[in-house]
Regions:
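Conserved S-adenosyl-L-methionine
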Residues: 171-275, 280-296, 328-330, 338-352, ...
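Active-site lining segments that contact anionic ligands and/or coordinate catalytic metals
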Residues: 269-270, 304-306, 320-322, 326-328, ...
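C-terminal, active-site-flanking charged/polar segments
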Residues: 351-352, 362-413
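Short, contiguous acidic/charged loop-to-helix segments that flank catalytic cores in large enzymes
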Residues: 25, 284-304, 330-339, 359-364, ...
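Non-catalytic, mostly N-terminal accessory regions of nucleic-acid modification and defense proteins
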Residues: 1-192, 251-264, 357-360, 382-398, ...
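Hydrophobic alpha-helical scaffolding
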Residues: 124, 146, 200, 228-232, ...
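Conserved Class I SAM-dependent methyltransferase catalytic core
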Residues: 14, 21, 30-43, 236, ...
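Hydrophobic alpha-helix feature that most strongly marks membrane-spanning transmembrane helices
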Residues: 215, 244, 248, 278, ...
Length: 500
């Protein structure tokens, strides 16, 4: 038996690299459920085993009593689904079938997981030898830190979601929002308690970051109630597993469903709504919802659902509720399809609290520039809106991908908090507080760059006339050098028979 490795360092990447050998010819979108399902199975097995051994040590014979586990929000794992059984079958041709049966048994014993877990490990195209090797890897690494709610499996699940998003490109938009974007929404909204809602929740990232925020600030996760839904059945299942790993109780509806046509929470009035809806969604069914009660500020156009999502969220706001959402930049200024009028009505209703223009290249899934919209039913700064131009923030972590740093996120959150407190001073090129009347004078366009102005450049102290004289001299020298090089190139081309 290999020695158990309890180190957290690089564990997420280790799991990912090992699991990648399983892929073979399976599409990334299908393979995702295999990898994440296996992580989930190991997680619930480890939690169950820890409690099981605790009950054995007590000596009262309650180790097979299901109630002992459910009382502590631990999933009960029947005998044929325990990791010892999986591990023993790792190097047999039946390993896929054994895992599928384990998943079915766990679903049967835990109603919350009914029809959620993947049961496709026996498929012929999944290499059983490699599957056994990954099972071995999981067997030899302890996946939870006992007594610590911030377990390594949650991080691994999150890491693998990000890697799948990177692989799937545009398709990943259905289930993944970059962590730094979600953290920015959460740090601004600060959802300490109340009802938290995401109408297009993907894999549940908004809820996970909310729980992390609460933990980091010494709060209690039980002080929030989580509601969400998603129209993609695979993504909906990913969210259920993701939240279960984190110990987050959530109502995501009884099944996946279209938010516009089958609202799973029609009576909900939420305190915090966070979402990253599909950008510029066309063909969303506007013609069948023309008289919907949610369109208080105007009927959204058929070819773009951005303001349908926005108004759906406003409809679900509690009297003191707040929204933080991601929208494509077109929504800041578009006049087509009545969008300008809808935006005008929302602004005049004094709902727009803050707009943040985000940097480019934050998403694996799209190059469309985006902004964060923060709305509030009962704004503290009446008749005013904060504009933040954060386009220059962030650091390139790969050639194609940018991330906001902790410092960047905190700067945005601190700026917003100062605005709410009434202590913020405008900063040229970064932030400005603007009255609704001034926004009206700009035809209700919400592009931050229009209001924050251009960052002031430090004066280097060199007199203008001297600077221009120096620069024109340098330019003249460069022109002269250019002519010399041009003549030399012509001469060399002529020497080999190519005259210009």
């Amino acid at each position: 038996m290999a020695e158990t490795n309890t180190s957290n360092i690089g564990f997420e990447k280790q799991i990912w690299d090992a699991a990648c050998v399983l892929r073979g010819n399976i599409d990334a979108s299908e393979y995702k459920s295999v990898v994440l399902g296996l992580i989930f199975l190991k997680y619930i097995s480890d939690r169950f085993e820890a409690k099981y051994q605790e009950l054995v040590a007590e000596g009262d014979g309650f180790e097979e009593d299901k109630d002992e586990y459910t009382a502590e929000n631990i999933f009960f794992v029947p005998e044929n689904a325990r990791w010892s059984v999986i591990s023993a079958a790792a190097h047999t041709p039946e390993i896929g079938t054994v895992i599928d049966e384990a998943m079915r048994s766990i679903e049967k014993e835990n109603k919350r997981l009914k029809d959620i877990l993947p049961k496709n490990f026996a498929r012929p195209e999944l290499d059983k030898r490699r599957l056994g090797e990954v099972v071995d890897l999981f067997t030899n690494i302890q996946m939870i830190d006992h007594g610590n709610s911030k377990d390594i499996l949650g991080r691994t699940y999150e890491y693998c979601l990000a890697k799948f998003a990177e692989q799937e490109g545009k398709l990943a938009g259905e289930f993944y929002t970059p962590s730094c974007v979600v953290r920015t929404l959460v740090e601004v909204l600060q959802p300490y308690n109340g009802r938290v809602y995401d109408p297009c929740c993907g894999s549940g990232g908004m809820f996970v970051q909310s729980s992390k925020f609460i933990e980091n600030h010494g709060g209690n996760i039980k002080n929030i109630s989580v509601y969400g839904q998603d129209s993609n059945p695979t993504t909906w299942k990913l969210a259920q597993m993701n939240l279960a790993i984190r110990g987050i109780e959530a109502d995501l509806g009884k099944f996946s469903a279209d938010t516009f046509f089958n609202d799973c929470h029609p009576q909900l009035k939420a305190d915090f709504i966070m979402a990253n809806p599909p950008f510029n969604l066309s063909g969303w069914g506007q013609d069948k919802l023309l008289d919907d009660v949610r369109w208080q500020y105007g009927t959204p156009p058929a070819n773009n659902a951005n303001f349908a999502w926005l108004q759906h969220m406003i409809w679900h706001l509690a009297p003191n509720g707040r929204i933080g959402m991601v929208l494509a930049n077109g929504s800041l200024s578009s006049q087509s399809g009545g969008e300008g009028e809808i935006r005008k009505n929302i602004i005049n209703a004094d709902l727009v609290d803050c707009i943040v223009a985000m940097p480019s290249q934050l998403f694996y899934t799209t190059q469309i520039p985006v902004s964060l919209w923060f709305l509030a039913k009962n704004k503290k700064q009446k008749g005013k809106t904060l504009f933040i131009d954060a386009r220059k923030l962030g650091t390139m972590v790969t050639r194609k991908l940018r991330e906001l740093t902790d410092v960047d996120i905190q700067r945005i959150a601190d700026t917003y908090n100062a605005f709410v407190d009434g202590t913020l001073e405008d900063e040229k090129g970064f932030c400005a507080v603007v009255t609704t009347q001034d926004i009206a004078r700009q035809d209700y366009i919400l592009t931050p760059g229009r209001y924050v102005g251009i960052e002031e450049q430090e004066d280097d102290g060199e007199p203008f006339e001297e600077k221009m004289s120096r620069l024109t001299t340098e330019l003249s020298e460069l022109f002269a050098k250019s002519h010399e090089l041009e003549a030399e190139i012509k001469e060399r081309l002529g020497a080999i028979g190519y005259e210009l």
